Swiss-Prot record:
Cystine bridges: none
Gene Ontology cellular component annotations, sorted alphabetically: cytosolic small ribosomal subunit
Origin organism lineage: Bacteria, Pseudomonadati, Pseudomonadota, Betaproteobacteria, Nitrosomonadales
UniProt xrefs under PROSITE patterns: RIBOSOMAL_S18
InterPro entries, alphabetized: Ribosomal_bS18, Ribosomal_bS18_CS, Ribosomal_bS18_sf
Assembly, per entry: Part of the 30S ribosomal subunit. Forms a tight heterodimer with protein bS6.
GO BP of this protein: translation
One Pfam family, short name: Ribosomal_S18
Full protein name: Small ribosomal subunit protein bS18
SUPFAM superfamilies: Ribosomal protein S18
Gene Ontology MF, one: small ribosomal subunit rRNA binding
Annotated segments matching region Disordered: 1-21
Family label: Belongs to the bacterial ribosomal protein bS18 family.
Domain of life from the UniProt record: Bacteria
């Protein structure tokens, strides 16, 4: 019995395309604040805040960092306060 192979219009195999787009290893996300036992996020801890800000100066979303929603809210207010006091830049141009 012949096996039917699914092909696209351009002749490439669909299954190979799916495997090629899949990442090799996906890191498990965890809340860094819970793991380190941090109760509140401090706006004066610049080294910690820089880990959650991308190169453009935007706050990285919780779905990417794995931060719990409680700490993500604290993180965003801490970044806003640090920006207001000129401890962190608003954008990458400053």
């Amino acid at each position: 019995m012949a096996r039917f192979i699914s092909k696209r219009k351009d002749g490439k195999d669909k299954d190979k395309d799916k495997k090629a787009n899949r990442p090799l290893f996906k890191r498990r996300k965890f809340c860094r604040f819970t793991a380190e036992g941090i109760k509140t996020v401090d706006y004066k801890d610049i080294e910690l805040l820089k880990d959650f800000i991308n190169e453009n100066g935007k706050i990285i979303p919780a779905r990417i960092t794995g931060t719990k929603s409680r700490y993500q809210r604290q993180l965003s207010t801490a970044v806003e306060r640090a920006r207001f006091l000129a401890l962190l830049p608003y954008t990458d141009l400053h």
